Curated annotation (Swiss-Prot):
GO CC, one annotated term: cytochrome b6f complex
Assembly mode: The 4 large subunits of the cytochrome b6-f complex are cytochrome b6, subunit IV (17 kDa polypeptide, PetD), cytochrome f and the Rieske protein, while the 4 small subunits are PetG, PetL, PetM and PetN. The complex functions as a dimer.
Pfam families: PetL
Function: Component of the cytochrome b6-f complex, which mediates electron transfer between photosystem II (PSII) and photosystem I (PSI), cyclic electron flow around PSI, and state transitions. PetL is important for photoautotrophic growth as well as for electron transfer efficiency and stability of the cytochrome b6-f complex.
Protein name according to UniProt: Cytochrome b6-f complex subunit 6
Annotated InterPro entries: Cyt_b6/f_cplx_su6
Membrane topology, as annotated: Single-pass membrane protein
Organism: Staurastrum punctulatum
Similarity comment: Belongs to the PetL family.
Residues spanning the membrane: 4-24
GO biological process, one term: photosynthesis
Length: 31
C-alpha cells in the first residue's frame, strides 16, 4: 500500500509540475 501512495504522490508531483510549466510557457507566449 505504501508503494501505491508513493506512486500516487509521484504522479501528483509530475502533474503539478506539468501544469506549472504549461502555464509558464503560456504566459511567456502571451507577452
Amino acid at each position: 500500500m505504501l508503494t501505491i501512495i508513493s506512486y500516487f504522490g509521484l504522479l501528483l508531483a509530475t502533474l503539478t509540475f506539468t501544469i506549472v510549466l504549461f502555464v509558464g510557457l503560456s504566459k511567456i507566449q502571451l507577452i
